[in-house]
């Protein structure tokens, strides 16, 4: 069984496209063929009471009940980079974003490269870590990083930066959501956690804007990566592996460029396959992912989860033409070679 997930492909009808959605408008003969020959229906990937997000949708698709396992994306991303959380640790996704004139301009810091972001994250960990010993910044991928607050409280409201472009970032700062009287053992209050995170956010702006990397960016007329934005926090989740939930899955893999998906794979007991050139953007190695999925099945995997982030990133950037391209790339450069290969096998392969 192979699941191919084009993250963020779904969208609203677009007037410029004659009232069609991007999936309706895009040229996708292989997706169309699979839909025609297979079974189609509506799948609720975000249960009632949960905000739409990749951590919810992808783990739901794998069969996890969010009421039992949901802890936000931070702990999943921690697992993917090998950070071992303690039970009292609060793990948050930490974007490096761009703000101008008090507003969020981009959620990705001007498309940061991982190597550049690593310099900034290590700098923040060194400088802010001196004043805040219970805080750790850990490098992830591109603009997506990890912030760990030892003894932090998860009952806080953090706004995902990609949901608030051109909004005043001061009005979106972290807020507590539990009364002061409700204290969890081993954790500081949610008010203290919110105050700590807001202080880190505010202090990061001056530190980042005065870093040589951003000074050079500003000289070149490029957007600075000038503010941290923590969100998606939670504690270490308690998840069964897919093999424990579904005994027919003896061996499985996940293929993704995104830490979050790799983290889900870690807790699901899946092998993470790293594909060279897989970027999470439109220039990702579609062919390499297809080849890796085919090889995993040949090697005896019962289940392969192939995740492609490119369409989601194009959507967040508001780039309609690029998003159309990513959907068509997925069809022609990833789905096509997989379908063409497995259709020659004697053993049937289910493709979702």
Predicted region positions:
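Extreme N-terminal starter segment of soluble prokaryotic enzymes
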Residues: 1-3
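Active-site nucleophile/metal-coordination loop of metallo-enzymes that catalyze phosphate/sulfate
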Residues: 10-137, 142, 146-148, 152
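Active-site-proximal structural scaffolding
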Residues: 24-27, 140, 197, 254-257, ...
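Glycine-rich, mobile lid/loop segments that gate access to catalytic sites or pores
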Residues: 108-228, 233-235
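Gly/His-enriched, cation/cofactor- and phosphate-binding structural elements
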Residues: 191, 320, 333-337
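Anion-binding catalytic surfaces of enzymes that hydrolyze or transfer phosphate/sulfate esters
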Residues: 230, 235-322
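Metal-dependent active-site segment of extracytoplasmic phospho-/sulfohydrolases and closely related
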Residues: 326-352
């Amino acid at each position: 069984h192979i699941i191919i997930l084009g993250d963020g492909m779904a969208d609203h009808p677009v007037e410029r496209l004659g009232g069609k959605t991007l999936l309706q408008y895009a040229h996708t003969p292989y997706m169309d063929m699979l839909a025609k020959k297979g079974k189609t229906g509506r799948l609720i990937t975000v249960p009632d009471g949960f905000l739409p997000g990749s951590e919810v949708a992808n783990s739901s698709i794998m069969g996890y009940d969010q009421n039992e396992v949901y802890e936000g994306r931070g702990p999943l991303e921690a697992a993917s980079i090998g950070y071992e959380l303690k039970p009292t640790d609060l793990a948050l996704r930490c974007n490096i974003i761009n703000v101008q004139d008090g507003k969020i301009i981009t959620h990705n810091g001007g498309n940061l490269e991982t190597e550049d972001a690593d310099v900034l994250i290590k700098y923040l960990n060194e400088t802010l870590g001196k004043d805040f010993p219970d805080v750790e910044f850990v490098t992830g991928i591109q603009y997506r990083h990890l912030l760990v607050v030892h003894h932090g409280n998860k009952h806080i409201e953090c706004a995902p930066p990609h949901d608030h472009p051109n909004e005043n970032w001061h009005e979106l700062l972290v807020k507590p959501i539990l009364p002061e009287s409700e204290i969890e053992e081993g954790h500081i209050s949610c008010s203290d956690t919110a105050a700590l995170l807001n202080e880190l956010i505010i202090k990061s702006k001056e530190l980042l804007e005065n870093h040589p990397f951003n000074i050079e960016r500003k000289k070149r007329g490029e957007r600075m990566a000038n503010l941290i934005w923590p969100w998606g926090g939670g504690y270490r989740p308690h998840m069964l592996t897919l093999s424990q939930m579904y005994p027919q899955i003896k061996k499985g893999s996940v293929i993704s460029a995104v830490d979050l998906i790799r983290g889900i794979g870690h807790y699901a007991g899946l092998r993470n396959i790293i594909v060279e050139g897989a970027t999470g953007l439109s220039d990702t190695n579609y062919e390499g992912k297809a080849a890796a999925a085919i090889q995993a099945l040949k090697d005896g995997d019962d289940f392969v989860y192939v995740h492609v982030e490119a369409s989601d990133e194009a959507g967040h950037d508001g780039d309609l033409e690029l998003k159309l391209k990513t959907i068509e790339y997925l069809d022609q450069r990833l789905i096509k070679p997989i379908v063409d290969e497995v259709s020659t096998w004697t053993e049937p392969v289910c493709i979702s």
